[in-house]
Amino acid sequence: MPNKPYDPQSKKYKYTKYTDGHYLVVKKNDHAKFDKDFPYIDKSKKFKRRFKAFRILVVGLAMPVMAVRVLLKVEGRKNIKKHKEILKQGVVSISNHVHIWDYIAVMDAIRPFIPYHPSWATNCRGENKTLIRYTGGVPVPEGDIRASYQFTKAIEEHIASGGWFHTYAEGSMWESYQPIRPFKKGAFRWAVKTGKPILPLAFSYRKPKGLVRLIWGKNAPLLTLRIGEPIFPDMTIPTPQAIEKLTIQAHEAVCRLAGIEPSENIYPPIYDNTLRIDYYHNPNAEPLDQQTEDATEEK
């Protein structure tokens, strides 16, 4: 396991009451419909042309900028090469979500593989919708059972046919947050249903230094991304147990890759309406007590 990582303990971000909450403010809304007829994995020629064009832009521009901005270090690329033949048959990768650009770091780390990823529907209607969509973002439908069925079907078919799907199993982005939050089971359900492995990745922090510190300040931590070994689902036990087992194994793996002993991580491995734990004081975080009281009054 890596050495104990740097903990930024940021007081800047409005971390939410529940560990899967979004605090990012999206300014635009084009009211796009993500229903049962939406092409979640778009196979049209028009989409593929634009997808390739954006890939060139990301590799040529965004990846170098990201690498310089956070002085990105990637460790464990040997595991991509070592398990290349297995990964070519389909894989679900997971990681913590700690930076607005960290998906670019993932894309860089797993080259030559090209991933898709589930994306918050609000983001897919917002000002960054084009960038998100053409870098593999798949909008997660909300409040529509038939749409959710088609979303899941498209993803499982993509994985089963040899595709790569990257998931932020914590459910949302919390910038500069060190603990590994509880995982939702969706990614692990896809892995079990398709019989494909989970590939754990983890971001951890380093103290800012050099030009990054001068330009962005002492509260802009540097990033390290570590790539682990594939974890295969246990196909000998019933599906619900296999999903739970895989979720726990993956959470422990991400903790270790981030330099955290699983038994010392402050959160459980599986999300269950889990509340944020304030192990340090962040005045900008959503107040826990007040929100709890409000929820009680509403009931």
Across the structure, where does each feature detected by a protein language model lie?
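Polybasic, low-complexity association/targeting segments
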Residues: 36-53
